[in-house]
Design a protein with these regions (language model features):
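Glycine-rich phosphate-binding loops of nucleotide-dependent enzymes
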Residues: 1-171
Length: 171
């Protein structure tokens, strides 16, 4: 489910994530003091910088609810990045995306990991995405860990193959 503020702009949605770093008092905000305007200008610049990761800066003034599904998913990730996390949890980020959007998402996840130097925990059923970007993979079957390892180790793990593809028949 998309968890955006549909009637707010793309930029305003990102700024929601930036509010945990407010650098002015409530009184400064009420009075619209110089500290307030300075912080608002910084928030605007930071929001556009984060949006540029997904090449969404030109959509800053669009209403979030009017964006296509894939763009809304990307906006959710940008808003999460605005909180300056040390761990980014992505729960099925490619769900509902077409193949070209998924490829773009893969590139952006790697870019985020490398640029922000943050750990990313990914829960995903798109095995192409998982096998191409994950450094370590943990496979669950009915809530129990059945394998941990690299993409190559997981792809060759008999327990994983049996759990997800079925047992091989003897010829």
């Amino acid at each position: 489910n998309i968890r955006l503020f549909d009637t707010m702009t793309v930029e305003e949605n990102v700024k929601v994530g930036l509010h945990n770093t407010e650098a002015y008092s409530t009184l400064s905000g009420i009075l619209r003091a110089p500290a307030y305007w300075r912080r608002e200008r910084e928030a605007h610049e930071r929001a556009l910088e984060l949006l540029s990761i997904f090449d969404m800066q030109d959509l800053a003034d669009h209403q979030a609810g009017s964006l296509p599904y894939g763009a809304q998913r990307r906006l959710e990730i940008v808003r999460a990045l605005a909180t300056n996390p040390s761990l980014l949890l992505l729960d099925e980020p490619a769900a509902g995306m077409n193949p070209s959007e998924t490829v773009e998402l893969m590139e952006n996840i790697v870019k985020i990991r490398d640029t922000f130097n943050i750990a990313i925990m990914l829960i995903e059923h798109d095995m192409n995405l998982v096998m191409n970007i994950c450094e370590g993979i943990c496979v669950l079957n009915f809530g129990k860990v059945i394998a941990k390892g690299t993409a190559e180790e997981i792809q060759n793990n008999e327990t994983v193959i049996e759990a997800y593809l079925g047992k091989r028949k003897e010829a």
